Amino acid sequence: MKKLAAGISYQGNNYCGWQSQKNIISIQEYVELALFKFSGEKIKIYCAGRTDAKVHALLQVVHFYTDIKRSYRQWILGVNSYLPYDISIMWVIKVHNNFHARYSAIAKKYLYLIHNNISRSGIFRKYCFNVFISLNINDMKKAAQKLIGKHDFSSFKGSECQSKTTYRVIYYIRINKYKEYIFVEIKANSFLNHMMRNIIGNLIEIGKGKKSKEWMSELLFLKNNKFSIFSADPKGLYLSNVYYPFYFNIPKFNFKLKNFLKIF
């Protein structure tokens, strides 16, 4: 039996999220079903991060065990032939037995897309969060810098968070505007449940002028999520990259925001 890893991209609009749930359509369920149809084996997959309902992924990483002997090309073409149009296997490789899609990851990056215009986006409405009030991007940038480094992010965790520690390290937060779209990228060692959406929600309130630039510092000091009541819509959120130690030889995902901007 060998261990394989796969890179997956998906649109999350039609799903309850990544994780399999009874009587609800999930991405994990569809991927495992496609693996079964292709291989004839009942395969359990393990992911880098369980995305919520309507959250997308430019790169999700999974691993699984199999006895089936197929080329990587056959795995990609075969499994994709059984998947819905909005889920796609991008690559498959053999990995060392010590590799784990979640626990071997050393960092993750999320992208959030805001459409900041008086009218909603007709084409991209399912892939961004519409904010009709003009946002002060400079205030958002200044506030975001307060979160860089190692902090207790208790104020930004979701109510269902079960993490043993609420300390996380944010390496950078980049906020860019292109036409009427605002892109927020956050790279951290890991994220708490709903942490990304809650950070974005509060940044938006700061951008609207409803909260001061010091609001992020106040939330870090308070360490209580009852004060952070602003959570951004999941449809604007993308898991955009997962990072691993070089010795696992996981394919690098060269996502460049400037290429993403060309879509718009």
Swiss-Prot record:
Homodimer. GO terms for biological process: tRNA pseudouridine synthesis. Belongs to the tRNA pseudouridine synthase TruA family. Keywords: Isomerase, tRNA processing. HAMAP family: TruA. It catalyses: uridine(38/39/40) in tRNA = pseudouridine(38/39/40) in tRNA. The lineage of its organism: Bacteria, Pseudomonadati, Pseudomonadota, Gammaproteobacteria, Enterobacterales. Formation of pseudouridine at positions 38, 39 and 40 in the anticodon stem and loop of transfer RNAs. Substrate binds at residue 110. SUPFAM superfamilies: Pseudouridine synthase. Gene3D superfamilies: Pseudouridine synthase I, catalytic domain, C-terminal subdomain, Pseudouridine synthase I, catalytic domain, N-terminal subdomain. GO terms for molecular function: RNA binding; tRNA pseudouridine(38-40) synthase activity. Its EC number is 5.4.99.12. This is tRNA pseudouridine synthase A. The active site is at 52 (nucleophile).
